[in-house]
């Protein structure tokens, strides 16, 4: 049996909670652990420096600074630029530690032994240092929990995790599946090589080919544009896999922001996507199934879950030594 959309019980794990909406007087606390939150801290430090002298990053807007620029500044850059990045890492780590402690007070999180840190900020040395510093802060405060960076590149983990939405029997005789990772800035679709002969637990699964659409950079994009792009891209990926004799399982796994209902609709949390994805009249899995009813000779099965859950699922093969973990 294949899980329903947004299911709590999946083939390898049970999802106690996701899309946690913990608020304080500044809003949702989870927003303060994002890549954007780190840049906000950098900008505040730069503002202080501009009042009293030169900005070591010049005229470049904080939102335009790349992860490589942060890494270079910390490793070999101007001493004041390094100081800004180091200060931002410290402030961010303190904030992340507070957020994790707040989450651990929740019933669903209280027995968590390990937390996997993903997201776009993870894919840099500065991000790894921030994770390490947060771990030190928590342990020094007596919080017994392990923090680890996500193994795969975050952009790929969101696709690889899609393979864990379906039972492994569905993949017998097949080489790969289709995965979709939907975000407020980008949408990705790709072919995930399952590599089951190398690792039946999917620990060797990898992205064989993928396409990216930076929809946030375009004007007047709506949800119909997103569906059209996905359908066209999935058909291209199916053709590419067929050309290379890579046998696709009749399955599409989707990671999407928000609270996912069993019928594939989105209750809330999709406000950053183009158009109104929370409408009761919009159902992405049904639309994709209508456009791609079969993959090869088999009927297409589609499962959609929250994007953070799907990214976290890419770590499932490496979590067998703990009972409860989060991401």
What are these regions (language model features)?
Residues 123-155, 211-228, 246-252, 258-324:
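Glycine-rich phosphate-binding loop and adjoining helix at the ATP-binding site
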Residues 1-32, 160-197, 262-327:
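Phosphate-binding/catalytic loop of phosphoryl-transfer enzymes
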Residues 100-114, 230-252, 292-296:
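Phosphate/pyrophosphate-binding loops at sites that engage ATP/ADP/AMP, CoA/4′-phosphopantetheine
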Residues 89-101, 159, 227-238, 310:
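Short, hydrophobic/amphipathic alpha-helical packing segments
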Residues 2-37, 64-115, 119-138, 147-158:
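Helical "lid/coupling" subdomains associated with nucleotide-phosphate turnover
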Residues 5-83, 182-232, 236, 240, ...:
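Short glycine-rich, Thr/Ser-proximal phosphate-binding strand/loop in the N-terminal lobe
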Residues 116-117, 179-181, 254:
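Short beta-strand segments enriched in small/hydrophobic residues
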């Amino acid at each position: 049996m294949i899980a329903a959309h947004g299911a709590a019980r999946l083939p390898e794990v049970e999802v106690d909670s996701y899309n946690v909406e913990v608020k304080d007087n500044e809003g949702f606390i989870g927003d303060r652990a994002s890549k954007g939150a780190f840049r906000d801290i950098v900008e505040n430090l730069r503002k202080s420096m501009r009042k009293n002298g030169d900005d070591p990053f010049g005229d470049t807007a904080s939102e335009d600074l790349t992860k490589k620029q942060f890494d270079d500044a910390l490793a070999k850059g101007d001493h004041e630029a390094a100081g800004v990045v180091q200060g931002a890492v410290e402030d961010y780590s303190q904030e992340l530690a507070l957020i994790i402690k707040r989450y651990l007070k929740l019933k669903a999180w209280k027995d968590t032994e390990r937390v996997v840190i993903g997201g776009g900020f993870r894919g840099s040395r500065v991000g790894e240092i921030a994770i390490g510093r947060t771990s030190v802060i928590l342990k020094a405060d007596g919080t017994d929990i392990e923090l680890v960076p996500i193994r795969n590149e975050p952009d790929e983990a969101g696709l690889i995790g899609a393979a864990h939405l379906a039972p492994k029997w569905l993949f017998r005789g097949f080489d790969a599946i289709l995965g979709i990772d939907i975000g407020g800035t980008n949408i990705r679709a790709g072919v995930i090589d399952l590599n089951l002969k190398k690792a039946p637990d999917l620990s060797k699964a990898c992205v064989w080919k993928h396409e990216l659409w930076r929809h946030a950079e375009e004007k007047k994009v709506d949800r119909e544009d997103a569906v059209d792009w996905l359908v066209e891209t999935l058909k291209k990926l199916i053709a590419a896999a067929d050309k290379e004799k890579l046998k696709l399982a009749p399955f599409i796994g989707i990671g999407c922001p928000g609270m996912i209902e069993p019928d594939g609709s989105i209750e809330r949390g999709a406000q950053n996507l183009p158009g109104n994805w929370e409408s009761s009249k919009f159902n992405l899995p049904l639309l994709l199934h209508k456009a791609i009813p079969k993959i090869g000779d088999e009927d297409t099965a589609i499962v959609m879950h929250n994007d953070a859950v799907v990214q976290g699922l890419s770590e499932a093969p490496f979590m067998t030594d703990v009972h409860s973990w989060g991401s």
